[in-house]
Amino acid sequence: MEEEKQVKVLTQDGERLLTEAETKRYYNLVNKTKELNEKGYTRRDCLLSVKTANITGNLVMLVPVAILCVIYVIANGFNFMPKAAIAQYGGLAPLYGLLAFLVSIAGLVVHELIHGIFWAMGASRGWKDVQFGFIKKNLTPYCTCLSPIKKPIYIIGALMPMMILGIGVSIVAILMGNPFIMLFGIVHVFGGAGDILIIAMVLKEKVEGRDVLIFDHPYDCGFILFEKK
């Protein structure tokens, strides 16, 4: 067992010193890699920069957001415009809008919880392998899995937050004709931008064997693919 001393690594966004939590995950990956290599798996790191993920991901998500907004307008008209919203909700409309936005931000915690629920289904130790945390630099919560999981479970776990909080809530908003609920849904469609890019990367990776495991990267943006041919 290697001594868990803090290490400096080169990530897609530059060199930096790992945090205590990242250091523990780093050594966990070292040990998991050894175990899987002994079982005949080969390792492949699949990474992208946070900047690329944010820019490309949000551009990609403009398509489903535009489609949802068009459907909303067809079904409910432009009741989200300031004058229409005030006519319908009175002077409380701005407050409702602010509240919807704040609840959307708070929903990021639920977003990560949904990741954890589905990934725990495929983790070797269930919930014990699911770790939650908070990135102070970006002011964002995160969820990661400490064990490699089957490819389908990884994809489902990555996709579900956007499907439930984004697409699902947006459909409810369209049916109810509620612009504030729609705001929540749209925020969480954009919130799934990085997840969609990761899923695309997983599907793009060519594998020769059927035994494929995906390991959430311990400190960088991306994942590690283990394949047994």
Regions found by a protein language model. Name each.
Residues 2-77, 134-229:
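Metalloprotease/metallohydrolase-associated module, dominated by Zn2+-dependent proteases
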Residues 47-51, 85-96:
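Membrane-interface segments at the starts/ends of alpha-helical transmembrane spans
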Residues 74-90:
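Membrane-interfacial hairpin junctions
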Residues 90-108:
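Short pre-active-site segment immediately N-terminal to the catalytic Zn-binding motif
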Residues 107-120, 161:
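Active-site recognition of the HExxH zinc-binding catalytic motif
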Residues 114, 118-123, 168, 202:
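Active-site-flanking alpha-helical
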Residues 122-124, 147-148:
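Short, conserved, surface-exposed binding loops centered on an aromatic residue
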Residues 125-135:
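Juxtamembrane non-transmembrane "cap" segments at the membrane-aqueous interface
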